[in-house]
Amino acid sequence: GLVFSSWASRIPDIKDALHLNEAVLGSVLFALPVGQLSAMALSGYLVSRYGSKLVLTVAALLYPAALVRLGAASSIGQLTLGLFLFGITANLCNIAVNTQGVGVERLYNRSIMASFHGLWSLAGFCGGLISTLMVGYDVPPLMHFCIIYAVTFAVLVTMRGSMLPRDTKPAGEKTPKKVFVRPDRYILLLGLIAFGSMACEGTMFDWSGVYFETVIRPPKELIRLGYIAFMCTMACGRFTADRLVTRFGAIRVIRASGIVIATGLLLSVLFPHLTTATLGFLLVGFGTSSVVPLCYSLAGRSKTMLPGVALATVSTIGFFGFLLGPPVIGFIAHALNLRWSFALIALIGLTTTVAAPMLRQK
């Protein structure tokens, strides 16, 4: 969370330093998701072959190192290659750390995965504050990223001894012998649920500010209010989700989350005013907060796939939602209008509600 937010917050500075226009920047930034997608299968294989502790240790060194490389980029080619490598190392870190999270959750014998993702959001918030401070003191991105590398290195050295030494299955469960197996319907359902939720997340990340600016039309200083509302409830929701799962069960929480997502989006579409739209975005943040962490948690319990491979499979399917959702919004907004686009995303959010009961059958 700290590494990614540090990069995202310094994009304007790097854009100005390399004299990039919006079109070129958009093309260059596409290298990041390409790198993430290309590493999905590799991440699952490496975690299953060498264990999440080793992969996480190496990835936790390479990920911030790739960030430093971005700060040192002096051309479009270097920045593009750097973003591709940044995406690969980010995904290695993501799959390995979530595999560790599944193992720790198994030892606790209760839901704690959402809280782990809440810490990611909290670290991202801290990264944004640090970046604001760095910009205020005119610290160049390269120096800023070197400081972040030092911080992450210190965290790794401090916490490595607390990592699980090996990835194990619960007593009585057989460990699949093959690393690559065909995903069963249970894993595909989890991927579909993650797809719907991440399509909503991607929409909020990329289009919430535009929606407020063009549809709600608040004072200029309040244009980012919807995005801030979404991020706040997303972080808070992750810290409360585990308690809800303990009380009501993961499937019921996922099912309710889809309803909350759709309600929030439709509220902002049907009543496009500052108060109602902000309330709607608050609901969307709370609804999306727990879905992906719970999908990862359930995928880690697969009886047919190794945890690392199951997580990589669900993450791959879900990430397509994050990648495809925002462009679809743009096409529909161009053909009709932005309110119709958000109404469609509300229906996509409901896929989590429709698919969740099927998990119980599987």
Name each model-derived stretch.
Residues 14-15, 46-47, 133-138, 212-213, ...:
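Interfacial helix-cap and linker-helix signal at transmembrane-aqueous boundaries
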Residues 19, 51, 72-77, 217, ...:
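Helix-breaking motifs and short loop linkers at transmembrane-helix boundaries and internal kinks
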Residues 115-164:
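Helix-loop-helix hairpin linking two adjacent transmembrane segments in secondary transporters
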Residues 39-52, 135, 237-250, 333:
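Helix-to-loop junctions at the C-terminal end of transmembrane segments
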Residues 54-68, 252-267:
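Structural signature of the two symmetry-related core transmembrane helices
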